[in-house]
Amino acid sequence: MVNVMNTLSFASLSFNSNNTPVSEQFDDIYFSTQDGLEESYYVFQDGNQLWQKWQTHDVESFVIAETGFGTGLNFLAVADKFQQFLSEFPNSKLKRLYFISFEKFPLTSEQLATIHKNYPQFATLSQKMTACWQPRQTGCQRYHFEQIYLDVWFGDMLDNLPQLGDLYTNRIDAWFLDGFSPDKNPEMWNETLYRQMFSLTKNGGSFATFTAASTVRKGLQAVGFEVKKRKGFGKKREMLWGEKPQQSETAPVNYPYFYSESQTEANDIAVVGGGVASLFVVLSLLEKGKKVTLYCKDNALAQNASGNLQGAIYPQLSDDDERNIRFYVHCFDYALQRLAQIEPLVNFEHALTGVALYAYNDKTAKKLEKIARQTNDDSLFKLCSAAELSEKIGLKVPNGGAFMPQSGWLSPIQFVQGTFAYLQTKGLRIVLNHEVKDPQFSEGKWHWQHNGKTFSHQILVLANGHTLTQFQQAQGIPLYPVRGQVSQIPTTSALQQLKCVVCYDGYLTPVSKANTHCIGASHVRDNAETHFSLEEHHENVAKLQQNLTACDWTQGIDESQNLAKQGVRAALRDRVPMVGQMPNFSVQKVQYQNLYNQLRRKQAVENAANFANLYMVNGLASRGLTTAPLLGEMLASLICDEPLPISEDIWHVLSPNRTWIRKLLKGSKVE
């Protein structure tokens, strides 16, 4: 298996006599020794005529792509300028800036902070960025600063550019063609880059670069750009800028069977749910200016699987498909950002004091060792001896295992209910005791009946867990319910010493303010019952005592109160969620019945048949606290036709039609 997280290398940095940062990998300066900030304004902002373009921009988001993030100075400068624009033109159509950048050798947060000290005017944004800056694997990582979105694609740009995929085709408004000079970094400045740039750029989109090298000019012209020269910055005689012709042909869709549609003009959105999955869809949609109504069938929010008193938040690391690992790590990092944003606004119990993974048998120990070889990041996952793990846990354990220091726990019910209440102050409308049934699409809206009244919305999002399969449109989605019961026990003098979540073939949380712990959880597949089970209650405690059999602190637990929370999780066999536009299974299985031969013969393939204006996020299983923030952001970005914070290969893994498309791609028949 590929060691996916070990492929990222950090920059070797030094400073020259002018205190300008220098890359030792490329033996080149990061920006002009004369004035790096003025160079950024002149070359990239003026070169792309950003201020003028923003004033006449006719959609809500503007997308800039940059070929080398470096010190982040270009980002800070353009983000600051965009904030000025929003202040000066509050009624402008343009509301959000997306800055997409690539970086093969990232600087550390400490190095960035040191360099940024020279630019105190950017102190606030720099502090926000460096606080959550933690490159740990290749691929996209989204950083979110209110109306400004920064997507940094770590790793080799020529590997990452194709992963922007179909959803970025013809989407980029302006390029900052930066990076080290062509003679220092010839691997970047080549035809592959220029062709990718051309297909990703909007008709009429522009680029600007500090160089005037003839190889660059000819390369850009050869793929279709109109290239022009202007005076260079400082001592440079010339620089290049240019545009993609307005009449350029749009690049073909590479994966039509995973095609999804956006709805930029639709503003009125209904979300069906009430738990953590729907929460983050709602949050991201509101941030993107949409009018959102939440419909919940219960008389209160977070009544199902999101209603536990305590739940762990940590990435699911496994020795399975490396794309799954990348997905869960990206989710975890984004979830930490979201928690940091929400924490000052909502009152909920939480403690990011780590999660201990206990090696309760040889098989588990070997699995943890394999994961450690794959991650190679002690801030994410670190093997521990028995003594080290005992210190982390706060109680003695006979075996070692692993520790995830940035992980922890929170109260899902407090978090979900509290954040929904906060979002109501931001325009969210919540309708309880309302079960959406048999929605039908006509005249550009989804309609359904409830208590003799008709309800209508332009877009319908289903984030309703295991009850998704009750909708006729969800035919073919292989979702199944998993009943889970979490036991609640009073604390003991020993358990009060527990410092972090302990995971084994179950989990135990530290003491809550109510002086209780949660022990979870039973796992009963194809069962949607929510009654209390005394058998499962005893099994939860027994599993703890059996897995940590030599630990006397697991004894003496009082389970006589029979306190527990039952929930039904929505799961999928391949253990990754689904997110995207709702596929029309009955049409697609006919549409693609000969897909294998069509691709083999290089014949044209139709775009996938989906239900118009209908979207879904589901299958989060027991990882909703970790995955829901990024999934919600992805779905909102798709709906709004804005950049997605995920690589195309992972997007395909998450596609709602993936199960039957996989079969059809192999030439198998789908019934």
UniProtKB/Swiss-Prot annotation:
Its EC number is 2.1.1.61, 1.5.-.-. GO terms for cellular component: cytoplasm. One of its GO terms (molecular function) is tRNA (5-methylaminomethyl-2-thiouridylate)(34)-methyltransferase activity. Residues 1-245 are annotated as: tRNA (mnm(5)s(2)U34)-methyltransferase. It is found in: Cytoplasm. It catalyses: 5-aminomethyl-2-thiouridine(34) in tRNA + S-adenosyl-L-methionine = 5-methylaminomethyl-2-thiouridine(34) in tRNA + S-adenosyl-L-homocysteine + H(+). Residues 272-671 are annotated as: FAD-dependent cmnm(5)s(2)U34 oxidoreductase. One of its GO terms (biological process) is tRNA wobble uridine modification. Its cofactor is FAD. InterPro entries: FAD-dep_OxRdtase, FAD/NAD-bd_sf, MnmC-like_methylTransf, SAM-dependent_MTases_sf, tRNA_MAMT_biosynth_bifunc_MnmC, tRNA_MNMC2, tRNA_S-uridine_synth_MnmC_C. Keywords: Cytoplasm, FAD, Flavoprotein, Methyltransferase, Multifunctional enzyme, Oxidoreductase, S-adenosyl-L-methionine, Transferase, tRNA processing. In the N-terminal section; belongs to the methyltransferase superfamily. tRNA (mnm(5)s(2)U34)-methyltransferase family. In the C-terminal section; belongs to the DAO family. Catalyzes the last two steps in the biosynthesis of 5-methylaminomethyl-2-thiouridine (mnm(5)s(2)U) at the wobble position (U34) in tRNA. Catalyzes the FAD-dependent demodification of cmnm(5)s(2)U34 to nm(5)s(2)U34, followed by the transfer of a methyl group from S-adenosyl-L-methionine to nm(5)s(2)U34, to form mnm(5)s(2)U34. PANTHER family: SARCOSINE DEHYDROGENASE-RELATED, TRNA 5-METHYLAMINOMETHYL-2-THIOURIDINE BIOSYNTHESIS BIFUNCTIONAL PROTEIN MNMC. HAMAP family: MnmC (MF_01102). This is tRNA 5-methylaminomethyl-2-thiouridine biosynthesis bifunctional protein MnmC. It comes from Actinobacillus pleuropneumoniae serotype 5b (strain L20).
